[in-house]
Amino acid sequence: MLLQQRKISVCIGALFGSLFLGSTASAQLSPPSDYGQKIGDVVVSATRSGTELKDMTQNTSVITSEDLQNAPNQTVDQVLKNQSSVFLNDQPYYEKDPTGQSINVRGLGNARTLVLIDGVPANDAMYGTVQWNLVPLSSIEDVEFIRGGVSNLYGNYGMGGVINIKTKKINDTGGEVSGSYGTFNTSNIAASKDLKVNDVLNLRISADLFNTDGYVQAANISPATSYPNRLKINGSYQNAPLLPGMGPEAAKSGNYRLQGDLKFSGDTTGFFNLGYHSMSNLTPGGYSGITKSTEESTFAGGVKTLIDADSDVKVNAFYENTSLWQQNATNPISSTTGTVTGPYYIGSNYNDPYYTLGASAQYTNNVKASLLDQVVLSADARQNSASNNSNTLSATGVSIGTAYAQGQQQFYGLMGQLKSKLDVIPLEATLAARVDQYQSQVPTYWSGGANGSNPLYTNAPNVSATKLSPNLGLLYQATKELDFRGAVYQGFHAPGLNNLIRSYGAPGSSYSFSNPALTPENMFGYELGSDYRWNSGFVQVTGYVAQVSNAVVATTMTPGSATWNSVCNAALQCSSTSTIYGNSQSLQSSGLELQAHYDISSKWATDGTYTHTNTVLTWLGAGVSPTLNPTGSQLGGVPQNMGTVGITYYPTSKANITANVRYIGNSWMDTQHTLPVPSYATLGARANYEMTPGTTLFLSVVNLLNRNYISYAASTSQTGYIVGQPQTVTVGARVVF
């Protein structure tokens, strides 16, 4: 290990040192004027109305192409984790279970924030998680991030905010090839080619491949215990996180895309995207030979027509078909000693085929009347459909329990938005409202014994709800540099199809049931903030409050109750620990957000963020333990204090070096506060060097000091303790032609 670290240090020193030897000729790596916040040029397309960044009434950030090129992290989720109010731990998405690759904004929980890729949803249609693998970092132009309620624009998923990942524009000709290699045998290759077919059509063909051997994630450092030692909480023993048989969690993925830009006339343009995406990784724990895999086929397309100089119509549609195959490992462990008593085996598997289909039409008119500047009207529809077939297996591979369900959801939305910019006083107002009709049906729902024997069929009711999502935003331009803003909003989040149809577990012990009768969650929130921008930087401060009611949570069933009798039978042998999802929690999150950037000189620039978050439960319904889920206690997996500081140095116009420090304060994995996560800080660095006008080399290091620490997470068991990403060195190159 010492020799390896010395080799790494030599490589880092050699490349960093070479940066000072470059020519001072003009190049792309030098900092642009008004770096990162060219207020007159930055338009936030995620608003659906082309709002300039300086006119946003909610806390908004734009991660520019320069930010992406300078970030030590090599995946978009790990770049986003350094933004204020983003709760993503120090574990890259490819090291997580496919059903756990989510994002939490403002402490409101996973699957409550919308993520878009060029305006098309990237949230998984069944689990609500984020398919981060669909777009590699090399394809991204910039990332727009609006915090706070956006259900007025998009309906479902709009509680925490919206993240819109924009890919690079297609050119008439040219292309790009990039590649990288690093620690844990991690490699990434990406290539794209643009070509002009004729005056109507421009195409881009692109592909990228990713592979890693991964690393061991289960923790064996304090406060976790080391095998075979156990931790006793609430009278029960919890096994050590790292058990015999566990290993590195390898992963690989591939993306293949065909994109097109169309210009039918001077007034009418269009686009289309076709893609095939695959990803597979070892099951959590890194059990060799037990894999999980996903395959997606995607399509998106749209047309925009200018009616006149001030108005246009857009029509878009998208489709995604996904197949998810999962296997889970079981390690036989003695309940009295906590020791492993035999080899691990495949304890369960399940197959989830599902799809999502949607379309929208939008009319925009920049009326520029005396009191009205813009009108936006929109209508959209979406359907999600899925089935789940879960099988529980014995150590010999024999089926001992089966559950099957099929369901679908429909969303129909109407949206209207008005914008006004007064001349008498420097006040801008945005008033938007959206009405959504939500429907869900689960026509098939049953659970049974071995190979589906003795099935118990449950009559699942159809669910329908109408949700109103208004939003009022105000912006007061006090001076050219200083503004004050505020917004109040209401939103909702429908239960995921996994909550409606996916039942799983071990018959006779712990079994978790889905609930087709779940209804949407509700959110009310408001925020106040201020932005100060000048030619050399900006400072943004925001305070917010958000309240979520009717939240979905796993509830413990009472033996013999009506709910128990509707899903449990003799073949399944439910136990006193069996759970079913219910709308049985309410929570409140409040906090302070700070973002800043400052160009110290033509050679030095610095960035910083800070987040303070208080997220607590405010109400518990039936089946939710007040001992495990006390009200008024900081929610597990939500650190109260987080911050980042970064600095970039440009020794020449062809080179730069970036270093950043990420700090996470003390937190807890559980809301009962029995599983602490100590505070930690990590250092990252990256160097870029332009060899020629079209060729750039880079070297990045995550966790530069190779600190061994536990990253924050949410769990009620110490088996949820995972280590943060170990020192990861990556060297790569990009060639643009």
Which residues fall in each region the model found?
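Outer membrane beta-barrel strand-and-loop segments of large Gram-negative receptors
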Residues: 356-362, 407-415, 513-519, 525, ...
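Extracytoplasmic beta-strand/coil segments of soluble accessory domains associated
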Residues: 34, 77-120
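Transmembrane beta-barrel wall of Gram-negative outer-membrane proteins
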Residues: 183-212, 217, 221-280, 295-308, ...
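Short acidic/polar hinge/loop motifs at secondary-structure boundaries
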Residues: 103, 120-147
